[in-house]
């Protein structure tokens, strides 16, 4: 679901960045911070998706600690409903990095 789509969007953004860097050598430097933030967000999403899947399987098998697994599912849902937009924001910032920064002349 959300995690796979996020990881794929990140992979697509990095592939496009690598292709565009052939004609804009500064692009990777302008985008680096946001690529790293996006990577972190995508990996957090994957971790929460995995926790949700494990919790769902445990609950389906009648795990003794249902409250623990239900809480895991609640936290995973919170991540995707409230925090998941951060990945989209960072990927948008990576795309925005294609705009060249103006050079600032430093006073001697």
PLM features per residue range, with description:
Residues 1-108:
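C-terminal amphipathic alpha-helical interaction region
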